[in-house]
Amino acid sequence: MTNTRRSDFDVTNSVQVSSPKAVLAAVQALYRPTWPGMSLDPLTRAFAHFERLFAGEVPGYYGVDTVYHDRQHTLDITLALARLIVGYERQQEESARLGGARATIGLVTGLFHDVGYLRRADDHASQNGAEFTRTHVSRGARFLEEYLPVLGFGAWVPVASEIIHFTGYEVPFEHIEAKVADPRDIMVGHLLGTADMIAQMADRCYLEKCRDRLYAEFVLGGVAIPMNDGSPQVKYASGLDLLRQTPEFVSEVREKRLERDFRAAYHYLEILFGGSNPYMEAIDRNLDYLRQVLRSENWQLLRRRPPIFAATTDPMATMRGLMVGHIKRVWSGN
């Protein structure tokens, strides 16, 4: 194994997180000894459906066309979630353990947590999934309401369609916790929300992806230049401006989401890694490097160009064209 972390591998440089088959194998290796005798067929079926869905091979859906929230993004988070779930389970008394069914539902929810970015065939007004940035979690919840019964988990719909919102900003967390009765389900939600944050911030190319890809999605999603009383308000002026605000964002995520809202659940990883936490260490390295770049203003230090795992041809060129057109329309008032 190479010592240099590859751009589409996890924080340990051992699992190719652009590959559904590789991530499924890693999940199975974690789940089998933790819940011996439990059938992993639902997970196998879910991963197969995920692969077809994101490739645009499921009737009624277009494939993934978002450049930041691509296939690798989801799979990286899914692997982190599996590790968190298993790490948690191995440290609990029996009464607090999740059990195999809940662990499976949690992972399936994680696997499809960003499915709301996929355009449906009846989304006639949209040109790119990034346009659903503000509503993608609710769209994902509706997908789970349809898909979980097909997978044989219809009874879990009320839970899954709530805890998916721990990955977003559409529903206040206290509202979720008021509706979900079992504290073990809340814990799965906290593990899911934790995985969503730490895996992407630990990505080897997180900084370049924020500048080049996330900013473009934020433009199309109305986040970078939101409208206020019919007038555009600039939140992020450019990809570089987004990077300048990233240290503050990461600090806020760590303090408010990871530590407070999710009860420092990231520590459950440490039993799997001899007491260390490779995700948090990678986040620290990314932040240290970003501060170096910001001090020097030498943006050429961010020169990685990792592949995009989308279903469309040249998705970045398409995204840039849509972004430029959107910005022109915003400032022209059309």
Where are these predicted regions, by residue range?
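Secondary-structure capping and boundary motifs in well-ordered enzyme cores
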Residues: 69-73, 98-107, 132-136, 183-190
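Non-transmembrane, amphipathic alpha-helical segments
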Residues: 35-38, 42, 66-69, 183
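Histidine- and acidic-residue-rich, metal-dependent catalytic cores
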Residues: 74, 81, 136-174, 232-233
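Divalent metal-dependent phosphate-bond-processing catalytic cores, especially two-metal-ion Mg2+/Mn2+ enzymes
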Residues: 2-37, 83-102, 112, 169-334
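Inter-helical turn/loop segments and adjacent helix faces that build the functional surface
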Residues: 88-96, 122-127, 147-159, 204
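His-Asp-centered metal-binding catalytic motifs of divalent-metal-dependent phosphohydrolases/nucleases
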Residues: 77, 104-125, 140, 161-170
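Short alpha-helical scaffolding segments that buttress acidic/His motifs in well-ordered protein cores
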Residues: 46-50, 54, 106-110, 160-168, ...
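Active-site flanking loop/helix segments enriched in acidic
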Residues: 51-80, 122-130
